[in-house]
């Protein structure tokens, strides 16, 4: 018989003819099964004449078996990639120790058995497979087929690690990565023949993602006495998540369960908050709700908004509102010039009726619409702008914040737009229903009335002060009193996408998945989700 290589060390090895039998003996220290076990309470003397190759543990063979599992593993999540990398790099085994499959595995499985409460399937975390295989090990139920001791040990080690990383990284940071699937959703152009596809960037919310430090901590915790506490700590510490989880526990309708699961996942994401506003103010725009929420410590102002159409979606982002411009000039984006403006090149009436003017970018000179062609406008050499004031597409005021998409919040010249229920029609910017009220909110309650009146007068609104009324009564005076106002301190802005949203009254409101983001997220979550969620009913 081939002598097994030394794998584990134990002071009672002198009682056994081979080191591996000592390890088998020590497996019983961790046996917690209450079922009848024919190998129960064995002593060292029981093994005195027992030499059987099927109990021979071989460290190298276990690692070879794990590498074979790695090669066959086609799971594509980041956590599965990390598990494969761990064993390819020949790092230490996490779950097998001197006492066999120790109690840390039981601690992990105990936590994993709760995944049904978050709508997930135990199968996605290999719970039944692990329990069966661990029971085999603890009962010495090996054979020469699929349950050889080294193959069984390798299988348990690898599946425990995959389940562990899936759970702790998923619960801490989210089981999906919106940077990947939302930013590879909409092609940047309609050229289907391009060798390298470019996509529109739709998600730019700063978030904390798992890094090397967290990964190292998770691996260290797998062997630590604090494993149970660590597994508790990675669970979402979020009141909204807990409320949605409680709703999931009583919800039986599959479609509504998916609605809950998608919005629970959004609560797992570790969004990096913008700088705190000293006055406790922040603005949230929820795209599916077509609403803006302006929060103050003691009140919330809500208003309707309009957002980007499905082909020109409003990007999700975090920023700070830092300025407002009154009667802004609109520099028309190149995408709109190419699609909507260039076909009218040479038509002077089209340009003058809309108060558009054309500027040569190189010389700064204004060019007559009659002298340009569509190819000239599409070349990028010419800027097309719309004069500020009445009739401007941006309305009478615009609210600016730093972002890489050239989007902003603004007024609109089409006030009836807000009578529509579905208001996804823009090229990406956000139209707001009550622009002056919003300006007043941003400036704060302690702002002087004359500044507010100058904004009102410049927007052709009725002034509120005697000074303002006197000014507008003099028809010789200009009504353009102010062009730009800084927002100090800056007010945090969050443009989000939540199809379940808790209002300021504490009520959960449900909204249509207008951009299809829930549907995309569902595909990402399906591998984890319990079968009773998967069929719409």
Predicted segments, located by residue:
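C-terminal motif of bacterial Sec signal peptides marking the signal peptidase cleavage site
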Residues: 27-30
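Cationic-aromatic interfacial patches
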Residues: 32-191
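Well-ordered beta-sheet/strand-loop patches within structured domains
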Residues: 2, 32-80, 87, 165, ...
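Eukaryote-specific, cytoplasm-facing alpha-helical/coiled-coil scaffolding segments in long proteins
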Residues: 186-198, 521
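N-terminal secretory signal peptides that target proteins for export/translocation
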Residues: 1-12
């Amino acid at each position: 018989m081939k002598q097994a290589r030394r794998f584990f060390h134990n002071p009672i090895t002198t009682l056994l003819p081979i080191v591996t039998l000592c390890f088998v003996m020590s497996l019983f220290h961790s046996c917690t099964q209450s079922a009848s076990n024919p190998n129960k309470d064995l002593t060292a003397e029981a093994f005195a004449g027992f030499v059987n190759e099927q109990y021979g543990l071989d460290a190298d063979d276990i690692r070879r078996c794990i590498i074979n599992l790695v090669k066959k593993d086609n799971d594509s999540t980041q956590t599965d990639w990390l598990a494969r990398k761990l064993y390819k790099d020949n790092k230490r085994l996490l779950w097998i120790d001197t006492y066999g499959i120790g109690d840390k595995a039981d601690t992990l499985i105990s936590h994993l058995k709760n995944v049904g409460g978050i709508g997930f399937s135990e199968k996605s975390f290999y719970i039944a497979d692990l329990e069966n295989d661990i029971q085999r090990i603890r009962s010495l139920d090996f054979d020469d087929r699929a349950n050889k001791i080294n193959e069984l040990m390798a299988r348990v080690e690898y599946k425990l690690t995959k389940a562990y990383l899936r759970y702790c990284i998923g619960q801490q940071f989210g089981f999906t990565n919106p940077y990947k699937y939302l930013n590879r959703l909409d092609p940047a152009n309609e050229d289907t023949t391009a060798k390298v596809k470019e996509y529109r960037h739709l998600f730019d919310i700063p978030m904390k993602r798992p890094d090397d430090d967290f990964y190292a901590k998770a691996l260290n915790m797998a062997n630590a006495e604090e494993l149970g506490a660590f597994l508790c700590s990675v669970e979402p510490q979020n009141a909204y998540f807990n409320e949605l989880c409680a709703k999931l526990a009583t919800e039986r309708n599959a479609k509504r369960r998916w609605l809950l699961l998608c919005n629970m996942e959004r609560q797992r994401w570790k969004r990096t908050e913008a700088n705190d506003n000293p006055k406790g103010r922040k603005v949230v725009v929820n795209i599916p709700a077509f609403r803006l929420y302006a929060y103050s410590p003691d009140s919330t102002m809500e208003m309707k908004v309009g957002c980007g159409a499905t082909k020109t979606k409003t990007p999700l982002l975090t920023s700070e509102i830092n300025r407002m411009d009154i009667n802004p000039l609109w520099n028309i984006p190149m995408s709109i010039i190419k699609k909507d403006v260039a076909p009218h090149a040479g038509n002077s009436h089209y340009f003058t009726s809309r108060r558009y003017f054309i500027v040569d970018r190189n010389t700064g000179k204004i060019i007559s619409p009659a002298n340009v062609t569509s190819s000239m406008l599409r070349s990028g050499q010419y800027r097309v702008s719309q004069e500020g004031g009445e009739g401007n597409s941006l309305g009478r005021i615009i609210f600016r914040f730093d972002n890489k998409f050239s989007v902003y919040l603004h007024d609109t010249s089409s006030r009836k737009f807000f009578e529509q229920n579905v208001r996804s029609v823009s090229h990406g910017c956000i139209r707001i229903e009550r622009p002056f009220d919003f300006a007043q909110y941003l400036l704060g309650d302690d702002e002087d009335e004359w500044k507010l009146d100058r904004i009102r007068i410049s927007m052709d609104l009725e002034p509120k002060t005697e000074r303002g009324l006197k000014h507008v009564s003099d028809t010789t005076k200009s009504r353009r009193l102010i062009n730009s106002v800084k927002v100090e301190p800056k007010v945090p802005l969050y443009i989000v996408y939540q199809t379940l949203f808790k209002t300021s009254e504490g009520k959960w409101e449900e909204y249509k998945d207008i951009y299809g983001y829930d549907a995309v997220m569902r595909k990402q979550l399906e591998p984890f989700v319990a079968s009773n969620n998967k069929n719409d009913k």
